[in-house]
């Protein structure tokens, strides 16, 4: 088994606490509302939403995937960190056992946020991860993030 690690960093004008509430704490409600073509719904299968919780994300008609299951490892509301693993679903190919994600939102000096993400792909056997697979995932995540950011700018009184 191999582990391939990818890091990404981008910025937002939205303050970290507000962004964390929308992007992490209420994502299961917000994303299907603003991007139903990407995510149809999210449901908790086990747990209470905290560490150990298993969620099923059903993708919308605009996605070429059907569903994935996430296992939440940690949610730190004070430090704005979140980690989970993608453990099942058609986004995992026959060559990938799981993908671990860590997200940290850091308050930036200008009042916005620096978003730092780490993805760790755990492969089966000696399989290598294709760069275009990772790039496509980053582009989709970036697009979804921009939708959330746009929603927050259009609705400034929400998630305070």
From Swiss-Prot:
InterPro entries: Bet_v_I/MLP, Bet_v_I_allergen, Plant_def-hormone_signal, START-like_dom_sf
Keyword Cell inner membrane listed: no
Keyword line: Allergen, Fruit ripening, Pathogenesis-related protein, Plant defense
GO cellular component, one term: cytoplasm
Domain of life of the source: Eukaryota
Alphabetized GO MF terms: abscisic acid binding; protein phosphatase inhibitor activity; signaling receptor activity
GO BP, sorted A to Z: abscisic acid-activated signaling pathway; defense response; fruit ripening
Pfam families per record: Bet_v_1
Role according to the record: May be involved in ripening of fruits.
Family to which the UniProt record says this protein belongs: Belongs to the BetVI family.
Subunit structure, interactors included: Monomer.
Name of the featured protein: Major strawberry allergen Fra a 1-A
Gene: FRAA1A.1
């Amino acid at each position: 088994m191999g582990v391939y690690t990818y890091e990404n960093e981008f910025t937002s004008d939205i303050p970290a606490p507000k962004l964390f509430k929308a992007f992490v704490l209420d994502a299961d409600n917000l994303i299907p509302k603003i991007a139903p073509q990407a995510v149809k719904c999210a449901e908790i299968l086990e747990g209470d939403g905290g560490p150990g919780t298993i969620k099923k994300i059903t993708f919308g008609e605009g996605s070429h995937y059907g569903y994935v299951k996430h296992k939440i490892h940690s949610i730190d509301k004070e430090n704005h960190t979140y980690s989970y693993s993608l453990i099942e679903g058609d986004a995992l190919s026959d060559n990938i056992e799981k993908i671990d994600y860590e997200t940290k939102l850091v308050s930036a000096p200008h009042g916005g946020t620096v978003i730092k993400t780490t993805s760790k792909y755990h492969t089966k056997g000696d399989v290598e991860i294709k760069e275009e697979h990772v790039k496509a995932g980053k582009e989709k995540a970036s697009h979804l993030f921009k939708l959330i950011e746009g929603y927050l700018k259009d609705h400034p009184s929400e998630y305070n």
